[in-house]
Amino acid sequence: MEFITILLSTALFIVTFLFLFRQGAKRARFVYLVNKLPGPTAYPVVGNAIEAIVPRNKLFQVFDRRAKLYGPLYRIWAGPIAQVGLTRPEHVELILRDTKHIDKSLVYSFIRPWLGEGLLTGTGAKWHSHRKMITPTFHFKILDIFVDVFVEKSEILVKKLQSKVGGKDFDIYPFITHCALDIICETAMGIQMNAQEESESEYVKAVYEISELTMQRSVRPWLHPKVIFDLTTMGKRYAECLRILHGFTNKVIQERKSLRQMTGMKPTISNEEDELLGKKKRLAFLDLLLEASENGTKMSDTDIREEVDTFMFEGHDTTSAGICWALFLLGSHPEIQDKVYEELDHIFQGSDRSTTMRDLADMKYLERVIKESLRLFPSVPFIGRVLKEDTKIGDYLVPAGCMMNLQIYHVHRNQDQYPNPEAFNPDNFLPERVAKRHPYAYVPFSAGPRNCIGQKFATLEEKTVLSSILRNFKVRSIEKREDLTLMNELILRPESGIKVELIPRLPADAC
């Protein structure tokens, strides 16, 4: 018996030794390959994490400086975690187009408590199933229905902005945010949020705070373990934000399900104009998910909440930023703003009628303005992926296991693709110029199998809101671009908002 015990113990020791030796050799190779990449000197244990412990309004400068100093391909160590930054379109393409590298990087795990396994953060068979089911919901007829919501909320926005005409300059960002929140609440969940009628929104505050907390946690390796993070003040604030965000969505889902049961409501394309309780009923994203779950698709209440939360986050915060940056750039370049006016005047002929889907399709120059705004200030400044296998990128072999940071902000400033990359020039998106560029030189909505399925929705919303504002006002930006402080959060925002002055546009104004 003793002999067997000794034999088993010896075997266990040998197996353990071989495993640890193999893991040690594997780790040594990983570290060796990573350290061959350009990058700053890393300190023991913490790596380069100390460099990112700066005031939140300085964090973007840290990332920007690294990219300019060490790019187009470089590495940093966040404690034991290797992060590789990419700033060239051909390098980014290698990651985005390949289904092997489809999993999101570590930073996304920090918003998973909020968004769960929705389309932004999910992986595997569940992600594939939901992606396949949800993608058709953004077809033309449904987007046409959503345009009615865009127009209605934009008209409320214009009325709110009228109160700012003739006064001092003001921050237009909160006005746009509340308009976008009204839009996304009605299109995503079928509810009237009325955020534009109220000065404060608990939901909006929670979205902003959870985004900031996520970024602050991501640059502090010692806060990565959940058990530690949950004990901190930041962790407690995060939990409170989750309570607000999940509570809001859960309440709406339950109310919507109850309404469907009471009324036998089956909203489909054929009856979205039916009268419900004396009011026209519009189709909402939530209705489509509930209908799918009733028709055999396996979606639990949690699955539905995760997709609605994802749609709410991606469809309101990103769009708000895109609209505000476009207004800032137009307000800084009156000659380009005048060209937009000319296009709108040609479409509407001086009429104050509501915007239609056909009108939006005719706004070709405004669309180029939006694209150029998103090039200079992409709403999502970086995309993170996990490298699943050793990959040759440029002159380097990057080992599997690295966290890949696809720096969209810098990809969009590649001088080989954009000869004057800092200039605001909507003609960068003339068809003949686009055809000459690398297909991954412009990826504000990501690209490949995990591209944003809501990009058409976002573009139509931005066109509607911007055209509504510009038909009624001339916009003048107060600050210069170099005076703005960019915030490196989940969404690229200016620290102090976008300060503008509005000048009323008279009916007789010539464009």
Curated annotation (Swiss-Prot):
Q: Where does heme bind?
A: E314, C452
Q: Which InterPro entries match?
A: Cyt_P450, Cyt_P450_CS, Cyt_P450_E_grp-I, Cyt_P450_sf, Cytochrome_P450_Monoox
Which metal ions or organic cofactors does this protein require, according to UniProt? heme
Q: Is Membrane one of the keywords?
A: yes
Q: What is its main location?
A: endoplasmic reticulum
Q: What induces it?
A: By hypertrehalosemic hormone and starvation.
- Give the enzyme's EC designation: 1.14.14.1
Question: A cellular component term (GO) from this record?
Answer: endoplasmic reticulum membrane
Q: What GO molecular function annotations does the UniProt record carry, in alphabetical order?
A: heme binding; iron ion binding; oxidoreductase activity, acting on paired donors, with incorporation or reduction of molecular oxygen, reduced flavin or flavoprotein as one donor, and incorporation of one atom of oxygen
Annotated signal peptide: none
Compartmental location: Endoplasmic reticulum membrane; Microsome membrane
Catalyses: an organic molecule + reduced [NADPH--hemoprotein reductase] + O2 = an alcohol + oxidized [NADPH--hemoprotein reductase] + H2O + H(+)
Membrane-related topology note:
Peripheral membrane protein
Role: Involved in the metabolism of insect hormones and in the breakdown of synthetic insecticides.
Question: What protein family is recorded?
Answer: Belongs to the cytochrome P450 family.
Name the chain's protein: Cytochrome P450 4C1
Native species: Blaberus discoidalis
